[in-house]
Amino acid sequence: MDSERGQGTVEWAGMLCVVSLLLLGLVAAGIRVPRAELAQAVADRILCAAALADGCGDEPTLIAAYGSEVGEMVREHMPSLVFEQGSRAVPVDFRRCRSTECGEGPEDGLVHRTEEHLPVTAFVHVVDCREGEETEGVDCSGDRAGNLYLQYWTYYADSATLRGVPIAGAKGYHHDDWEGVQFRIRPDGSVDERASSHNGYNSGLESSRNWGSDAGIGPLKEGAEALGARGVNGWGPETGYLFVSGGSHAGNTFDLTDSNRYTPGRRVHLIPLEDIATTSTAHFAISPPWLKEVWLDPEAEGTS
C-alpha cells in the first residue's frame, strides 16, 4: 500500500500548488476569501475532479440518506479491502454486473475498478439504536440500546469455496454471494468490528477458533466464546481492514498492512441500500441483506 501513499504525496503537493495559485488570483482581484475554509473546499473539489479518491463523491448521497453525522461516519469507517493472493473477484453493484467476467479485477496491486471499469462497491445499511434516533422496526433491545451499527454489504456474482480443486466439482459453489463487514459504535465512542464468514461472523482470530461459527455449529461457537477464545457473536476491536478469502469471499478483520492486492476504504464506492431494499425486484440464489436476520437485529449471530 505504500506505493499509493507515495503517489498521493506527489499529487497532493501538486494540488496544493493549484490551490495556492487560485487563492492568489482571488486576492489579486481584490476579493476577500475565508482562508482555511475556502482552501479546504477547493482542495476537496480538485481531489474529486482528479479522481484521487473514487469514493469522495459518495458523501452527499450518504448524508442525504443518513444525515450529516451518520453519513460522514459511514464514509469514515468503510474499511480497506485486502484480498487473498491469487484472487480476481472484487465486489460490484449487482444492478450493473452479475457475472464473474465483469466482476474481476487485476491480480495484484491497487484495485479500485474491475477490468470492465466498474467501481469496487459496497452497499450500506444503518441500524441506529441511539436514544431518540432508533431506526423504525429494528431490534434495539438489551445491549443494543445506545449503539449505532454500520453494515457494509458486498456482492459477488458467485461463490466457490473449493474453486480450483478438480475432485470437488460443483461442491461449495453457488450463484450470488453476499458478504460484508459490520461496525458497532458504542455510546462511549469505542468501535467493534466483525466480518461475515460462511454461517457466522469473525474478527481477527486464527481460523481454528472460528470453526464453530463458520460451520453454524452452535455448541462449538458458544464454547469458544465462553472460554474467551473469540468475541461474542464474532465481535472484536475495529481494525479498519476486511480480509477477503479467495473463492468463498469469507471475511475476517485481520490487521494486514502489507498486501499485494487491496482497495483502500476511501476508494470503495458506497451505495445506501435502504431504498433498494424496498424497490428491487431482483432475485438471488442467496438471500440478499434485507432478507437476512441481521438487517433488523444487528446482534444476530448467523448470516442467513
Where are these regions (language model features)?
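N-terminal single-pass transmembrane signal-anchor helix
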Residues: 4-29
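A domain-level signal for the mature, folded cores of soluble proteins
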Residues: 59-179, 189-304
